[in-house]
Amino acid sequence: MRREHARAILFPLVRLPWLLIVLALIAYGAVLAGGIVPALTGAAVSGIAMFTLGAALAIYTGMRVGAAPVRLGGRAASARRAYLTLAFAATGVLYLAVIFGAINTSAGTLWTCQTWPGCAMTGDSAWLALAHRGLAGGATLLIAALAVQTWRIRHERSLRIAVAWALGLMLIQNLVGLAQVLLAQGGESQPVAVARLMHLGLSATAWGALVVLTTLALRRPFPAVALLRPAHVARPGMTDTVLLEGKPSLLKDYISLTKPGVISLLILTTITSMYITPAGIPELSLVLWTTLGGWLMASGSHSINCYLDKDIDVNMGRTGRRPIPSGRIPAWHALALGIALGVVAFVILALFVNLLAAILALAGFLYYVFIYTIWLKRTSKHNIVIGGGAGAFPPLVGWAAVTGSLAPEALLLWLIVFFWTPPHFWALALIRQKDYARAGVPMLPVVEGDQETRRQIVIYTLSMLALTALPPVLGMLGWAYLMSAAVSGGLFLHYALKLRRDGTTTTAWALYKYSLLYLAILFVAMAVDRVVFA
């Protein structure tokens, strides 16, 4: 009887926060539509709606998370006050940014302030727009500082997830806000309306994540000795509770998930491809945006690769020291990082380069993740041959970024990288053959043996060299490139034939290392020939 009575009381209370959330979102949506309500009324409605949303989220979070007070010493108590002050400051500043955003939407300042970050116009409209942008920038900095503090001294997974969502949403909404200003220069359109709704909607969602974070920080026990004890030494099997606490090399570990050393060569092929198109020398801003978008897209695919290959990496000496198999970073962090980087990269390329470049970069991302990592790498001895197509997308992205289209010349660049990949990677596979066998990865040396692998390296090397001779024949490049390609290609063939003959680890290492230099020399020679000697 008591249980039924308690249920009768608590059930409506559990439903109440969700009812408040729905009502708040409906009210806020009316303001986002823009022009439906006057500016001051819009500010009042949005303010009440956001306050109601925050209160409902705080109530719901508090009901789900029981309070666990802890008596703290002076140092820990001071750290807790500082952390909560930062959390409340970030929440408050973002609340004001959301309100000013709603006021700007109702007042239509988007059409009077179409420059960024400042305003060419003066008056009340400019003041409103600048106030909103200043508050949004301040909120972003506060959330970033809060994220650093959360990862440094708070080990609870729920807090880290909440602050990651808040920071990620805030960064994305900033990009959408910039895109909104650029799109508005072309007048009212459906993309502008969509961007406006996304911009304010994302900021409101980020504010909700901050409210949840602050509520959790108030209810959860603060680590009494988090600032005093030394960092934990990571071990395989460590739980999220102790993982990453005070780890000084955390940033380095996250960067390593993206494999920056590999990306640098990919980006080089992207940049040089931009300089050999018929369109001539591209603008520096276009090169920079393409480089940033391409780098982030490749970083995202590599991060997801680390997540998917965690069971393989732990069995290999070369990869066993990576952050995930060594236990320094939870695997799901790599997945979340990869998805976030891919989304941001696509937005950057689509907005500041062109849609074709964004689609091609995304195609390379999906090719690498699904066709190579998930499917071929684990099932076929041809994994490197077919999967190597993923690494050949960067030249296509660079070409499309400048021309807005693809041409046979761009596909030739794709083929050159495609045929370069097997000799390059099989040389490493010969060296790491035992590791791949232990991990159950059917690389060609594991399945067919050393002799067949060395023979295939020579075959693909000859095919690659034949392709590199085509640009001058097709009138795409001239004699300067041809001389560089002949000399560097001859040295590549020398290493491949030497490996075919003696099959030593030393020769395999020599071919592997030179193949990296060779691709860089080849594409730089293309750009130099086009820019200097054309």
From Swiss-Prot:
One GO BP: heme O biosynthetic process
Protein keywords: Cell membrane, Heme biosynthesis, Membrane, Transferase, Transmembrane, Transmembrane helix
Annotated spans, Protoheme IX prenyltransferase: 252-530
Chief localisation class: membrane
UniProt GO MF annotations: protoheme IX farnesyltransferase activity
E.C. code: 2.5.1.141
InterPro entries from the UniProt entry: Protohaem_IX_farnesylTrfase (IPR006369), UbiA_prenyltransferase (IPR000537), UbiA_prenylTrfase_CS (IPR030470), UbiA_sf (IPR044878)
Annotated metabolic or biological route of this protein: Porphyrin-containing compound metabolism; heme O biosynthesis; heme O from protoheme: step 1/1
Other remarks on this protein: Carbon 2 of the heme B porphyrin ring is defined according to the Fischer nomenclature.
Biological function: Converts heme B (protoheme IX) to heme O by substitution of the vinyl group on carbon 2 of heme B porphyrin ring with a hydroxyethyl farnesyl side group.
Annotated protein name in UniProt: Protoheme IX farnesyltransferase
Organism, as annotated: Roseiflexus sp. (strain RS-1)
